[in-house]
Amino acid sequence: MPASGGKTAPPPGSGPGGPVRLTWVQPEDLVGHEFRQAAEDGRGETAEPLLRVWLAAGGHLAPARAGASPTPAPPELRALATDLLTALAALPTPAEPAARPDPAGHGAARAPGSSGRPLAPGRGGAGTRTEAGSGVGGRARFAGPRADAAGDGPALRRRLEAAWLGRAVGCVLGKPVEKLPLHGIRALARAAGNWPLGDWFTERGVPPEVLAAHPWNRRSAPTSLAENIDGTPEDDDLNYPLLGLLLLQRHGKGFTTADVGRLWLDELPAGRTFTAERVAYRNLLQGLEPPATATHHNPFREWIGALIRADVHGWTNPGAPAAAAAQAHRDAALTHTGNGAHAAAFVAAATATAATGRADVHTALRAGLAVVPPRSRLAEAVRFGIRAAADVRDTAAGFDTVVDLLHARYGRYHWVHSVPNTAVIAAALTHADGDFTHSVCRAVSGGWDTDSNGATAGALAGLIAGSPDAIPHRWTAPLKNRLATTVPGFDGIGFDTLAHLTAQEAARS
């Protein structure tokens, strides 16, 4: 995500004495992103007259990579942006094809712009019904009995520790190059003799002109290069699994979407949220209820934020991909709809399958796809990524070809959108075929949201590895079994302790 610990660079004028200029919430920036979302979800033609009004008034398109445009809009332009956001929300959205009907009826989806009434308090076991925002993704159904959770006890705890470690490794690996374009990532790694990517990024040996052309993520480089990693730095890709664990400790697997919102208000600093999460947080403070928190003036509702919250739902439902997907959808409904929620369900189901200790990575990915509407944009992208990765030889050079294909096909999306990022995660895991190092390195070398992709791929690859000892020491040693976070009660915690706490929640009914 764009991302951790306030990683998004502040716009000019936002330093001491300047305006606050909070990112990801300014109407003049949100409306540009909503026009982009409209083009993606089938409203582009009907939105065109509104776009002409916006541009004629002096408005701009969405910032390509930053969270805010360089300067604030004048009051009249900001008011117009707010009005246009409301008008865009009223445009009918062509629905994507629905998932196949399922008698259990988990996770019935809700269309964009639907009523802001609170979600029905679903109880997330098999045979129950939960509601989640769907955007344009059609009706997502999560069905099936809970499978026997193989390997409970010590074996499950070892897998969970490997998953937590894998998530941390992949996240930290991707942090220095987050927001960089693909050619910049490749240039930095090649200059260090680290391409194909196989180790931590480093500044050692990189010529000054390369560093000047492709500067590291300025917030992450001091804590995430090979020469300075000293424990696991804070990141939203690690904060959200902690919050998910806290959610389950307080409310159990029957939590409601409203429970998620209350937990955030109690325990999550607003400044540690980004994109859809920040907009939803603002909506909560304005008195809106889910699912309106996910839809009201939230152009980021199909981005990657719900996906990075999904692992804990899979970890705590080993062998029960349907239940994991239903939990993830209920969590996602606070902030995301459509493909954003589908991505969370995909990861949760794949993770739950891998958590048994009996499935290979390809079986896990198939389980993830089984809970996604098969004709949604997300399912199409994941299938494309898997096919592309399966069609090339299992070498890093071959994966460069896969990445080039993905960027050619999905480069129109924002770099934080769920569709391209889920595709590259699936492609990386497929190509790596269960190898931990290859999984995280392929995911990060694919570009886009590098720390989120590395984290998700690393978590699933850790489960497949089955034990912390199966992850190469060069990855785990610098993290020192220590995680920094602003989530209360967790700062400095070890991954072994997190595995124990997660296993306790997995054992709860």
Language-model region placement:
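Long, charge-dense tracts
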Residues: 1-101, 107
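Long amphipathic alpha-helical scaffold segments
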Residues: 72-154
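Accessory "access/gating" subregions that flank catalytic or transport cores
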Residues: 107, 139-152, 277-304, 308-324, ...
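An N-terminal structural lobe/cap that precedes and organizes the functional/catalytic core
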Residues: 112-116, 122, 138-165, 169, ...
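Catalytic phosphate/nucleotide-handling subdomain of diverse soluble enzymes
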Residues: 169-175, 179-197, 336-339, 345-353, ...
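Surface-exposed loop and adjacent secondary-structure segments within mature catalytic domains
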Residues: 182, 190, 195, 206, ...
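C-terminal domain-closing interface element
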Residues: 214-233, 397, 494-509
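Aromatic-rich carbohydrate-recognition surfaces in CAZymes
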Residues: 221-260, 264-273
